[in-house]
């Protein structure tokens, strides 16, 4: 049985495994932050996500998969951030060949 992209994503985030995380991101991926409007390609995203995963104050408190099929993943996560703020983050991903080709947070 194949492990879902959501389950793989949760595992690499829990383990703070940057290489494993980047393995889930398609080489042609676009990452978009709705709140700030920032956009990244995979090579730009590498340093951003690496810094987040190395910071112990960047914490995934709880997460649930709302929907996943071979083309799309939607999850809802409660996050804690370095500035002692907390947010609910909706993640919407388009999938291609088992990898994230487009990721947008809300």
Label every model-predicted segment.
Residues 16-20:
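Short helix-adjacent coil turns
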Residues 37-38, 61:
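Sparse recognition of residues in long alpha-helices and their boundaries
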């Amino acid at each position: 049985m194949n492990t879902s992209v959501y389950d793989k994503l949760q595992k690499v985030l829990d383990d703070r495994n940057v290489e494993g995380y980047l393995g889930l991101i398609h080489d042609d991926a676009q990452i978009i932050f709705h709140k700030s409007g920032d956009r990244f390609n995979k090579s730009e995203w590498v340093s951003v996500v690496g810094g987040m995963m190395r910071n112990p104050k960047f914490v995934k408190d709880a997460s649930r998969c709302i929907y996943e099929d071979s083309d799309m993943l939607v999850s809802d996560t409660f996050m804690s951030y370095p500035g002692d703020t907390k947010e609910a983050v909706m993640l919407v991903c388009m999938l291609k060949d088992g990898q994230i080709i487009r990721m947008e947070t809300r």
